[in-house]
Curated annotation (Swiss-Prot):
The keyword Cell membrane does not apply. It catalyses: [protein]-L-isoaspartate + S-adenosyl-L-methionine = [protein]-L-isoaspartate alpha-methyl ester + S-adenosyl-L-homocysteine. Belongs to the methyltransferase superfamily. L-isoaspartyl/D-aspartyl protein methyltransferase family. Its EC number is 2.1.1.77. Keywords: Cytoplasm, Methyltransferase, S-adenosyl-L-methionine, Transferase. The gene is pcm. This is Protein-L-isoaspartate O-methyltransferase. GO terms for cellular component: cytoplasm. It comes from the Bacteria. Catalyzes the methyl esterification of L-isoaspartyl residues in peptides and proteins that result from spontaneous decomposition of normal L-aspartyl and L-asparaginyl residues. It plays a role in the repair and/or degradation of damaged proteins. The keyword S-adenosyl-L-methionine applies. It comes from Vibrio vulnificus (strain YJ016).
Amino acid sequence: MSNPQAERLVHFLAVNGIRDSEVLSAIARVPRECFLSQAMMHQAYDNNALPIGQGQTISQPYIVAKMTELLRLKRDSKVLEIGTGSGYQTAVLALLVEHVYSVERIKSLQWDAKRRLKQLDIYNVSTKHGDGWLGWENKGPFDAIIVTAAAESVPPVLLQQLNDGGRMVLPVGTDEQQLILIERQKDQFVSQVIEAVNFVPLIAGDLA
């Protein structure tokens, strides 16, 4: 790692329980400042969620690493991301798997994320402007689904787009939110509460 700030961040993540070396390497390789406004760049390697406009945020690096680690990704895992946002989480995923599918309900965020990913020579991502509650059915089923905004309850449509043996990680709740891991075992879904979190809400529909 040639970026001392990234190196310090990765050390912080490891000390705080992130064990997957490939996830840590991906975090180190993605320049978080590229996904922030000029005014926020000085905080790029702090472990904080930061505003990206449109009432949305870029998640804190610990949460990005934790959610990614929980998915137990393999190189050939087919991944769906709900909520492209800045594209930072998308970029981390793209370094770990062959292809990422990502849905964003706010058109301007989708286009900004596409531009940033292209600038970083990340081309193994397909993005779509649409309603995240609906997933991306014609590209599924998926081995892993990651939701980057909090739903009041688990969207049943997303469960149906999960492969047998697949994993989904998402925040659930309104005022008090929990990070939930769900694993599909044939027609059953086994869920586990991971920890308390704080995300922006997952809103149905899409915006121009």
